[in-house]
């Protein structure tokens, strides 16, 4: 989860509010372009913020290997599969997946296929531009990097080394 503590001692959670505060404080570094492109960036950022989160929750809690990895790191000890049942969040995961439309195996496969497909498109784009939408960063890059850094590259599954 993205967290930002401000000089006023506010703690902001979630990428979208964090980006909005940063834009207000550092307008020269704005991640939301002006005019029509800014509208598109805002819409894509908002959609990806919710869509990527649901896929990440699926990966984390439908794959015991991922749950074991994150709960071992969080507890500071090497857990066994049988230990997972002791963690309330382990039981929360499947409920969250049901609420976000990744409960059924067919929904899980569809979400994974969409996510991997999006990453492949992004990789192709980044072969010709520095950032997802061109040669300067936008809020879309922040959203994409958040899911990649916090989950995809940190958890055992999916394995993007292929």
Task: Go through the PLM ranges and name each one.
Residues 54-162:
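GST-like fold's C-terminal all-alpha helical module
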Residues 1-82, 132:
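GST-like domain detector, emphasizing the conserved glutathione-binding G-site
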């Amino acid at each position: 989860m993205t967290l930002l503590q401000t000089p006023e001692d506010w703690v902001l959670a979630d990428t979208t509010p964090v980006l909005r505060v940063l834009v207000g404080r550092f307008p020269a570094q704005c991640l939301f372009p002006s005019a029509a492109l800014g509208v598109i960036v805002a819409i894509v950022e908002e959609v990806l913020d919710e869509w990527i989160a649901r896929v990440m929750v699926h990966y984390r809690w439908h794959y015991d290997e991922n749950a074991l990895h994150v709960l071992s790191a969080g507890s500071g000890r090497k857990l066994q599969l049988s230990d997972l049942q002791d963690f309330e969040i382990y039981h929360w995961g499947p409920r969250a997946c049901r609420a976000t439309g990744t409960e059924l195996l067919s929904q899980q496969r569809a979400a994974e296929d969409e996510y991997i497909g999006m990453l492949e498109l992004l990789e192709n784009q980044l072969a010709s531009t520095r950032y997802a939408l061109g040669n300067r960063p936008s809020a879309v890059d922040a959203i994409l990097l958040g899911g990649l850094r916090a989950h995809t590259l940190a958890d055992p599954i999916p394995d993007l080394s292929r």
